[in-house]
Structure formats: C-alpha cells, structure tokens
Design a protein with these regions (language model features):
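C-terminal helical subdomain
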Residues: 53, 66-168
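Residue-level detector of anion-binding/catalytic polar loops
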Residues: 50
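Catalytic loop of short-chain dehydrogenase/reductase
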Residues: 2-3, 8-46, 55-66
Length: 169
C-alpha cells in the first residue's frame, strides 16, 4: 500500500471498545483495534493509506443470536460500500475514525435481504443514537464509578443466554 501510495485498511471492531461488555479481554481487544486504526491513519496519511474501523450493531452469527441482529452479509455490505462507493472526500473524513455499519447503510443505501421496506434499517438507526451520543463523551470507557453490569438487570430477557460465557457459574 505504501509503495502504491494508496490503500484502505478496514477493521471490524465493537462498541465493547467504548464500554464494559462481556469481559476485560473483549473490551481491551476492541479498544486496541479502534486505537490502532487511529494511529495507522495518523502515520500513513502522507502515503494516502487510510485506516477505518467499523462497528456493527448486535449480530446474528454462529456465536451470537441477537433478535434482528446484523447478519454477516450486512456487515460485508458495509465493507463493500467503503471499498466501492465511498469517494476520496468521504474516506479522508472517515480516516482514523470509527463508523457504525448502520450509518454506512443509511448513506450508501444497503440493507438486509429481508428488509423490504427499510424499517429494519430505520429501527437500527434510531437504536444506535444513544450509543453515538455516549461516544461523544470524553473517554466514556473510563467510567469506573458505575460498577460492572449485571446481565440479569437488562430489559432484554434471556440476554445472558446469547453468550455462552456470560452466565455466572
């Protein structure tokens, strides 16, 4: 990429890099990926190599099963949109930043295969607003006063069942 004076490095991370979620390893790994994109963007800017992190919403994968969660195909469409549809101006502004897949869907017009009327995208977009507002706060990941979350306190019944390692023993 440096030799070609052009490139795009994309990382897929998680909101778990901003708040405590699951465990220490999960949060630290995702915070490191977010920071790595920022640092690479800083160092590689003069070589026209951009680094961007994308944050999918809750997912539907072989490991998690959030109701109406984003499919791997949806996340793949976000990657393709950045590679094929985003212009240089957009990529320059996104360089070093963390972007939500739902914001990319809204901008570039992709959706889940089953979302025939766009209502799933709209619900996800509305649902992402509190997370984006929290990200605007100064270092929200360093709020140690709130204590650790209790998965039993969530308003989503069965939340702990979504993660095999989440239930207390």
């Amino acid at each position: 990429m440096i030799q070609n004076n052009s490139g795009l490095i994309l990382q897929i991370s998680s909101y778990g890099g901003f708040i405590y979620f699951c465990d220490v390893g999960y949060g630290v790994a995702h915070a490191a990926m977010d920071r790595l994109s920022y640092d690479m963007a800083t160092e590689l800017k003069d070589q026209n190599v951009r680094a961007i992190t994308i944050h999918p919403g809750a997912g539907q994968t072989e490991i998690t099963a959030f109701p109406d969660g984003e499919s791997p195909n949806f996340v793949g469409r976000a990657v393709l949109a950045l590679m094929e549809k985003a212009d240089d101006n957009f990529l320059d502004q996104a360089n070093g930043k963390t972007l939500f897949t739902i914001d990319l869907a809204k901008k570039f017009g992709f959706k889940e295969d089953y979302d025939t009327d766009g209502s799933v995208n709209e619900a996800r977009y509305q649902g992402s607003k509190p997370f984006k507002e929290m990200m605007l706060n100064t270092l929200p990941q360093y709020d140690t006063e709130s204590g650790l979350p209790k998965y039993s306190d969530t308003n989503n019944e069965g939340f702990a069942d979504l993660f095999k390692g989440a239930k207390p023993k």
